[in-house]
Amino acid sequence: MELDICSLGNALLDVQFSIDDNFKDQLKELSIPFGLMTLIERQEQEKLINKLKAQYGEPLLDCGGSATNSLIAASNFGSTCYYTFKVSNDNAGKAYKENLLFNNIRHEVQTSKLNLPTGQCLVMVSPDAERTMCTYLGVSSSLNCEDLDNSAIKNSKYLFIEGYLVTSQSALEASIKAIKIAKKNGVKVALSLSAANIVNSFRNEIRGLI
């Protein structure tokens, strides 16, 4: 199996709302920085989603996550892609896997004994197209070294790591191991920095990946 890109990342279902400028004030009241990604708990996210539904109606749902978006784009341009991630056996997880197959992305989905749902990213898009994201990682945060497909990494031209993985200790350790395997086998490594607040908050962890 020869691949162009092998990647690991947070598998998140995108829940997207188009908001108006007035909602920016409500975000400020909730201490959610406009234009950035903030990690929140499940109950907080559900409460905010219900608030948005009341004001803007039903959201758009789609397969998301930083690495996923990059792989879908690469696949649509003809690259052979492979993805390692974690979702639950819930409706969101099933829809996620179906979307990857639709986009011709080979994948190894890992199951977890943890009673956690598939992760979700609440995306609020303002009139000027700026995105504010509130993410609940769910089961994706349990991605670990045992989930890696060493063969897929070795047989790829590139290993792509999304910077958001540094927010989970087990995912960070998996990223470090994957990079070591890649470098040992002459596979080029690409790392996204994801967001300014991720770099500021996890500077040492990101340096550890370089």
Where are these regions (language model features)?
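Glycine-rich phosphate/adenosyl-contacting loop at the front of the ribokinase-like
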Residues: M1-Y82, K94-A95
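Cofactor-binding loop segments of dinucleotide-utilizing enzymes, especially the Rossmann-like FAD-
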Residues: L8-N10, K86-N89, S112, V125-P127, ...
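Conserved phosphate-binding/catalytic loop of the ribokinase/pfkB sugar-kinase fold
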Residues: E108-K113, V123-Q169
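Hydrophobic beta-strand scaffold residues
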Residues: C81, H107, V189-A190
